[in-house]
């Protein structure tokens, strides 16, 4: 019989230190082995020289780092990063399109309804990245017609500060957040700005109905805009419990911050964030090369390294303690589910007054 060794504080710390040491290896400009197709695409991209990336599903620092990593591997092709929340990015793109301006070459968004709209209007290019079949099956074929692909995933969970909430009283489910003991302690982003928060709200509305949010209001949550505002509110100690992706807070816990991550018994929300190449791109080769890079081994390793983000690829191990959607109860958000987001935003404003 095989015995499983228990995970102790010492062994967990050792794993984290080993992981950190691995991440400390400096990046190099060495290219991976390029296929003939990718090399041909790269040669064409070098003639274009740059691309502009509209992106919502990373913070600004991470998005800029991804752009630098791409240029290190593909010298001569620069990435101009335009980063904002999902709805702000899409508003800017919509203004570009109305003005006939081809400013964005690549769009990455946490809101799948953006891609459904663009696809319907024939504003996305058809492109299947070479790396598309290298991701876990769960993340393949976000669009069967190859107009957008999953390039990032988030597992939305509950986080709490141990100096604000005792472990015995900590929430175990989304329903627990309705308990009066969390009044004045909760922090969330806003579905009118953040695609991730929108997906979370759509999921819980579908599961529990809008009465869930009406009850949640009674606990006086603090509502930011971006889901990243939850990090700010919890890091400052202003609030003690919130919902966000799990990676950032697991990393902070390993670094000594008073955080614990709860994978809700009624389901962590799995959100796929997509990427598409704009049909009117003036840098179509650079755009395709970059879209392929986002799901490369190098790019996915960079995300795990910097943010402890979930990996889309089986050949890129997750950070210490990372959970996959197969290991915990989940609520999975489909493209069709996100069509409900427009009406939900209005209900959210009516309920929470913002």
Give residue spans per PLM region:
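Extracytoplasmic ligand-binding site segments that recognize negatively charged/polar headgroups
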Residues: 54-67, 79-97, 102-238
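N-terminal export leaders
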Residues: 8-13, 17
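Periplasmic-binding protein-like
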Residues: 153-155, 181-192, 214-217, 223-224, 255-281, 294-318, ...
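A bilobed periplasmic-binding-protein/Venus flytrap-type ligand-binding module shared by bacterial periplasmic
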Residues: 159-164, 201-202, 271-286, 302-303
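Short, polar/charged alpha-helical segment
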Residues: 35-52, 56-78, 158, 252
């Amino acid at each position: 019989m095989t015995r499983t060794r228990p995970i102790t504080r010492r062994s967990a710390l050792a794993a984290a230190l080993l992981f950190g040491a691995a991440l400390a290896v400096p990046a190099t400009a060495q290219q991976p082995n390029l296929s003939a197709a990718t090399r041909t695409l790269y040669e064409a991209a070098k003639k274009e020289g740059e691309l502009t990336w509209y992106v919502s599903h990373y913070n600004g620092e991470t998005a800029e780092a991804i752009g630098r990593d791409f240029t290190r591997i593909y010298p001569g092709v620069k990435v101009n990063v335009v980063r904002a929340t999902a709805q702000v990015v899409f508003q800017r793109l919509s203004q570009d399109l109305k003005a006939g301006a081809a400013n964005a070459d690549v769009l990455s968004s946490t809101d799948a309804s953006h891609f459904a709209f663009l696809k319907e209007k024939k504003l996305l290019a058809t492109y299947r990245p070479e790396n598309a079949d290298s991701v876990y099956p769960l993340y393949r074929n976000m669009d069967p017609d190859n107009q957008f692909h999953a390039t990032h995933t988030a597992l939305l969970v509950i986080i709490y500060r141990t100096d604000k909430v005792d472990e015995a009283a900590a929430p175990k489910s989304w329903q627990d957040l309705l308990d009066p003991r969390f009044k004045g302690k909760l922090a969330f982003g806003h579905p009118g700005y953040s695609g991730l928060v929108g997906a979370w709200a759509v999921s819980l509305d579908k599961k529990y109905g809008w009465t869930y949010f009406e009850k949640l209001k009674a606990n006086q949550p603090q509502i930011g805009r971006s889901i990243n505002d939850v990090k700010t509110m919890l890091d400052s100690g202003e609030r003690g419990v919130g919902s966000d992706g799990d990676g950032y807070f697991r990393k902070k816990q390993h670094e000594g911050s008073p955080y614990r991550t709860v994978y809700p018994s009624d389901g962590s929300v799995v959100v796929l964030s997509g990427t598409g190449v704009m049909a009117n791109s003036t840098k179509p080769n650079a755009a395709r090369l970059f879209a392929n890079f986002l799901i490369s081994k190098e790019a996915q390793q960079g995300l795990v390294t910097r943010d402890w983000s979930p990996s889309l690829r089986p050949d890129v191990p997750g950070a210490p303690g990372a959970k996959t959607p197969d290991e915990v109860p989940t609520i999975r958000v489909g493209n069709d589910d996100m069509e409900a987001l427009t009406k939900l935003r209005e209900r959210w404003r009516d309920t929470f007054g913002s």
